[in-house]
Structures are given as structure tokens and as C-alpha cells.
């Protein structure tokens, strides 16, 4: 980025700021925010500023732009961090987690959804994987509907904490997951501050329910329900409750909820609303009474319980006194009436608990769907989306718990990014300048400590000792805190409240309600009333044994949140963390509105300045010696030998790699147990080199496979045309063993030809190209370029015009328009194409290849079987429909075709060829085998690890001790492969096995001897055996060895033997396949590096000598 652009848009990594201060950080974030660059890095930490509008900077196109890219290659983005986490999980095979922090409304939930979307998009697509992806993505709208709400600071505020673990298999595909939910804000069910809403699902149901649902659940407008009308806020800008309800129902289907389960959930949501409409008045005794019996009846009917049972559970509290029924003890039960305030509290407790338990069931149901296939998993990526730090005008127990969890997360961040990093430098002996920072451990101890007791412990003690009291407990709690914490730097007492100086600022908490909310108990008579419900789903949510519960000390809300926070920290500590620090730029929730004081406050309490200083002074990457060696050992030939192992010390291995990569000494340091790399660009360099290494190796393997596949296909084509021509056409000797090459005119570089064809090759695949001889009606001949693609047949004329070579397209015929082809039964090379309008007569010595390729692609395009006629009198059509005939005759005086006018058109004369009964099927063609290898030239070996393998030699080999290196035959002076002995004078080489019947033996193809790589070792990269004549072949050329004249007799037990040092898979029918350790009887040896041997099974063949150890 240029200085001019940076001055306008800001730098995308705060580590690169020229000056480092909180003001400079804020100014840089503002520049980027105003230019719609909402993401900024601090090294690996991502800062995200909520734009409060859609910037269209996510989705499939952006995902593709970040897929597989290193962080230094692409601009900051949530996708960048997600790619880093996913890559680290796959490469290091270690659990990862993404911790998203920031205050309410800063954009944490959206960041979490982007991560889940990215991981789903870049992973595999099997049926099971796609199912898990859908559940992961559809769980978001479902849980948001039941767990999110509009608050004063955020229109879609998460009112619960969620830690989502996505489980991956070894291939990096999601195969399952698990959601952990924390601290649902139950109090919102029954009360909301002015300008806020209850959970989204209530408004979605009332707006989007069908007419039938509204009748079944007796639904009306939000204004009709006490639990919704207290805040006078029913709609939200940018939220469509009708469409959101449809999305929720779709998500329920995707998750796999049955129709009955969906109906039960919607019924419970309606139940909560109807419970809230039960109002109370005071009777003449001062006790609570039902104001409207119809409201009670409606709520009871929705709960599927008797109205009298519900009424008694709300208006009376059952109190048991006395012993447990033993001798001398009497147990008494009393129904104590409640006043209006107590009845309201009981009603609200019932509604809160029903909704809370239904939400917990929903989370567990999503987990069941995620583990539907019960697939084993290798690693996880955890995504933490939890409520942000909250400071309101009036803060209570809920804010205290929320802020405690955020305090723990801040401590976790400090421990891993500031404190632990600096301590590690000292521990490893790395030169380092300490950076000062605020450690909030003191605040965490204040809240959860044991000695001295923390605030949660004091609150639990108050609730335990004063459990029977309902008044005065909050004041006792304040007094007890004052006695212990008076003078504490981060606690301050005041009338009816106390203040804590958190990392994000001082928050004042109203003590009223702390004790009751911490008890978090539901009266047992209420539980027993719900257990009477005739709705099985509702009753299952309250399946506890109330009798045994009464004997236990109840668990407090404070204890639960402390335990949950501890478990969360433990889960996070088992992962490699990645951080997203979300910033809310304003309170108006408007785009382009920047409140500098608010942003600066967040920059301060998030510790961004200290984070920048640590990153500038520290090292971008560190890892243990063995992991660095394992990751980068391919980058040095010394650490990446033929077996891929390094026998030396891990420290020396790391040094070797860095030195061979020419890394400057100042870019890296070696600690006591780890390697430290200073700049991310250096890591990027290593990763890029690693990718290139892998790409090069992959490309070689792919090329070898493509070559093998092409040659196999060529063999199949030759076998097919041999079958087609057998007993129908005489053959020319030089065409019997001719290999198919497809392109004989270097089409890729014939730009004039391509242009004449209107660049058809960009849309069509060229499958044959050559120069042909066009024969016209007067027997005149002219050269054309003929190109056959998978779609059409092209004829192009070349001519010189004004000293310039010009290509002119004569005609293009679609393959499906071809009516057929005709050829004679003699040995000529004439082909007559029967085409629309007029036919085309050509001569070309690759006629067999042309016809078989045309037959193949004619069928592939849907034309069926091409009509191929054999006749010595062929009728063909000229322009304007004139009919002509070309006839063929033999004359031994015409070794090449002679065409003259005569008869009804043209007469072609040619000498006799090989008999039509000649079988031209390739000798090494086996229709039942994939190994058609002996006709293939052996691939060349590459430097480094061996490539270029014969058929069957490419499988991974077991590791061998270095002392068992395979001996490599030494080349003779003069370089190159060692030449084989020349054939004996006076005739061809001896045939393999029994003498071949008939005439002179045919020329054989040489084969290259398997060679170990220069490092020695495994045959994993061996080539094919060198320079030996093919089976049944004639004289070997230069480098060939003399073949035996007759087959040798069966081996006798007294003959010498050899032991196989390595596995070998034969690449032709005359070679011998064997396994390491096999005993081979020696038949004969030659000087060309081959030994003829026989296994105990009687199988005989040739084996490379350097694979054997003679006994």
C-alpha cells in the first residue's frame, strides 16, 4: 500500500503504524471505517468495527477470494481469520477456537455466522457432510429466534452465551458438532426495559402464525400480552417478523424436529404469553386472588393441566415442617397463602423456568441432530459468541454475571497474548523488552476468589444462612461485602448498591434482587403441578424427583455461572485461540456515525495499544522444534530424503531448513524448546515454498497419470481399429505398430489455423490434427489441414497471398451431420467422408487413427454407431449433387497409390499389402488388465524424491534402513545409461522364449532399468527397467540386450538363487512380479542389468538385477 493510499484509508495492520498511541489507533480505525474497511489486523488478531449496514463484503465470491490464501496475501476479514484457523486445524491436527469479544451491539454474532458460513463453504460435499453443514447453518436462525432480543444498544442482541464446536474428520470436513449454552437471560421473559423487546420468537409467532395456529393457540396482537406490552416496543427497523418466523419453521425442518415437536414448542411459547396474563387482586384477608378466571382457564388449558391445580400452585406455597417421619418425629404440611407480590413472583418464576427449560431442550435437540451420523472426529474449531460487556443506568444480577464472564475472557486474552507471550520469551531465553499492561486477575479474584472469599461466595453464604427470609437479605449481602472489601482498589460500596472497577470501566450494581435471583429456585409444588400436565413434552421438561430435591442444598445461579465459566475456560485452553475484537462505533446504530470518545474507551479496555506494542516487539510465529521440522522438512533435501525422515536432532533439522532457505539470521531465533520467527512475511515465504513443493510433486504425478491414461486409451483405440479392419482391409506394414499421437501439426502454435477456425478450440477439444491430401474430381491433389474436434470436422486451405501465409476455412461439418465414411479393402490410405451437400475424398497415412477417433466421438456426441463401409467401388457426391465413383485395383508396380481419371470417375491403383487377416492388435494389449505399460516410454526421474514410476511402482513403500540402499548400476564412461550388448552378427536378436513363427522378428521397444534416487533407499520412485527388447521382439536397438534363442528348461533345485530386496510389479508379460523376501531361482543373467528367474510357483520372467541379492 502506497503512503498516499495509506494516509487516506489507513493501514490494514496496526503493527505497521508509524506512531503508536491510542489516538493514532482510533484515527486509523476511523479512516478505514469511513472508507468501508471495517476490518483491521493486529498481527493475527482481527478488529471488526460494526458498519451498521450491509457492505456486500461477504458471500461466495469473497469466500473464493480467501480460500487457501495465507493471511499476508489478502486484506483483513473474518474469512481471513477463519481460513487461518481452518488451515491450522488441518495442518497441525490441533483444536482451534475463535474468541469473539466486544460490547453488546459490536457485531459478534454476525462475525460468528460468517465463520460458520466460511467453514461450511470450503469443506467437502458428501451427503453426510452436507447434512451437518445444513444443521450448523440452520441452527443460527433457530437459536437467535429463541435467544436473541432487541435491547437499547443492539437490535439483535444475544441474550445467552454460545460456544459452538464444529467437529472435523481427518480430511477437514465437518462431521458433527456441539453447542454449549450459557446464562440465558430468563428475566427478559417477564420484563423488559422501555424501548426493548422480549425474545424474537414471541413477535415472530404473533406476526407469522397461520390462521389455524392463531385459533389453536388463541393468539392475538402483542399489545394484548403483559409480558410484551410493558416496554411499548413491538417492531424493530430492519427486522421482518413474518419472514423470520417462516425461516424459523424452515430451520426446525432442517434440524429434524418432528411435526409434533414443532407443535409442542410453539404451544409452549403461547403458554408463556397466556401465563403472563394471569393477574391478581387482593382479597379481604390481604391474600392474592385471581382477577380473571378466564385467563387462568386459558393458561391451564394451554398447559394441559387442571385450572384448580394451577391456581393452587400459584396462590399457595406448600411448606413442610418436622422430621422425615421417623419415631418421635411428625411431619406437617401447610398451604400458606401468598400475597399479590408473591403470587406475581411465583407466576413469573413459572414462566421463566418453562421458557428456560424449553430453550435448553432446543439446544440439546440441535446437538442430537449434529451427531445424527455419530461420525468419529479428529479435531474441532470452537466459536465463542457470548454476550458483550454491559453497562446500563440500572444494572442488576444479570449484568453482574454477564460482566464476570467477559472479565474471564479478558483474562484469558491477557494470559495468552500479553502475559504468556512475554513470559515465554524469558523462559526460552529470547531477547526481549518487557511491555507493561493491566492484568485483570485481581478483578476475577474479587468476584470468584476463595481466599479471601469472592462476591459469589459471599452471596451463596447469605442465601444459605438466610434461606427462609425474603426481606433484608440484599442489605445483609452489602454489609458483608463492606466488611471484607472496604479499601479494595476495584470495589466501592454505596447505599443500596456497590461498584466494581472492571477492565471495561466501573459499573454500579443495584443490590436489590441479588439474593432472590441467585437462589434461582422454583417451588416444588409448581414443579409437581407441571408434572401433572397431559402434554408429554412439557412434563418431560420437569422430570426431576421433588422428594429427593427437598433433601439437597439447592444449587445457586452464581455457582452455576462460576462452574460454566470454568468449564468454558478449560475448553478454550485446550485449543489454539484466534481473536476477533469487535468495536461499536456509536450508540445511534447508524452507518458512518463515529463517536471517538466511545471508540477510544473500547480501545483502552480491550488493550489494543498493549497488544500492538507486544506484536511490534515480538515474534509473529513460534512452535516447537519437532513441529517446525515436521511441517517444513520438505524444503531441504537434507531433511527430506528418499524416505522423508531426518535422523538427526530436531534443532539441527530446523537450522538446516532455514539455512537452505537462505533466511537471514535476524529473522529467526532458537529458544530452548521452540523456534521463533520474527516477521509474518518469513512464515509466508516458508508456506509459499511448501505449497510450491507440493504443487510441483502433484503436477508430476498428475502428468504421469495423464500420460499413462492417454497411452492406455491409445492401445484400446488401436485394438478396436484392428478388430474393425480384420478380414476387411489389407494393411501397410508401417501402420501395424504405429502409435497414435493425435496432433501432427503442432496445432497449439498454429495461430493462423486457429483464427481460420474462429478459435473453435477454445470451446471444442481438438482430438486429431494433420495435413491431408484432398483428391478432387479430376484426380488433382491439394494439401488441406484437417482438424477433428469433439464437436466438428474442419478442412482448412493454406495459401500464399502477397508473400503471407493465409489460412482459409473451406468447410466445417458438425459430427452429427456426418453420414458415414467409406474405405477400400486394399492397402491404400483413401477415406471418403459422406457429408451434407457434397462428400470429401482425402488421403492420409493415419487413416486408422482418423477413423477410430471419428467413430469414438461420433458416438460420444449422441450419433450412435458411425457407418463405416469397406468397398473397392465407392460412390460419392460432388457439389450440385453430381454422382461419381472411385474404384480401386491392385498392381505390384505401384508401391504407393496412383489416382487417375477413368471409368465413372477415378481409379486408384496400389500394390498388395499385408493380408486382411493380419491381426494388428497391439502385442501388449490385455483387455482385462489396466497394465498396458511395456509400450510406454519410462517417465524421467526428477530431482529430490523419486518420481516417474512404472506401472505398479508408485505405491507407498515401507521404510527401509538406510544401510539397505538398493545398488544403482554405474553408467559407463561417456554418460547416459549403460548400453546393452549388440546383437550377434548375421541376424536379429534371439527371440524371447520359443522362436517366433514366420518372417523376420519385429522391432522391439527398449525398456529402462529401475533406478534408485541419488539419496538411495526406497523403490518408491523407481523408473522402468532400461534398454531390453520387448517380448517377441526382434533386434534391440542401441542399448538393447541379446535375447535368448530358445526357452530354457525348467529350473532345477541345485540352481543358484537370489533373494528379492524390494517389491517389483511387472510392467509387461515377460517380466516377473515378486515381493520383498521372495526366493528366486536364477535361470540366466545378462550384462544389461536383467536377470531371468523363476519363482517357486513356476512363474518365470525377467527381473531387474539390482532388486536382487544373490545367495
Curated annotation (Swiss-Prot):
ATP binds at residues 102-109. The modification Phosphoserine is found at residue 332. The keyword Ion transport does not apply. GO terms for biological process: actin cytoskeleton organization; actin filament organization; actin-myosin filament sliding; cell motility; chemotaxis to cAMP; endocytosis; endosomal transport; exocytosis. Residues 547-627 are annotated as: Actin-binding. SUPFAM superfamilies: P-loop containing nucleoside triphosphate hydrolases, SH3-domain. PROSITE patterns: MYOSIN_MOTOR, SH3, TH1. Belongs to the TRAFAC class myosin-kinesin ATPase superfamily. Myosin family. This is Myosin IB heavy chain. It comes from Dictyostelium discoideum.
